[in-house]
Amino acid sequence: MVVYGQDCLDEISLSAPTSVCEIKDGTFGEYVITPEEFGMTRCTKEELVGGTPQENAEITKEILAGKKGPARDAVVLNAAAALHVAKEIPMQDAVKLAEELIDSGKAQKKLEEFVSLTNKLAEKE
């Protein structure tokens, strides 16, 4: 799956339709998706602009802690695309799964495990 937000983003966009190219069962397909198809509200690109690495880390922590809004919706849609491909499930189901993983705290726990592992590896250097 390759996606291109029609607002020049290299990911699924919340501010414009997204063009998708996908190979499924050996067949190449092209289609367009919109945030509204997945129950998301369209927003402006400016609402999704990050900041410094520290600010982006804080935004990520807030999303994984349950904060709703455009940033979370962008994370959900793009995580859903990865789940759609990896688990071979419909995008609608992948969106629900991404939301469940965030809402249950499993995504936050996985991030904490990753941070712990990378810190341990850094200490060994």
Regions found by a protein language model. Name each.
Residues 1-125:
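Glycine-rich anion-binding loops and their surrounding alpha/beta cores
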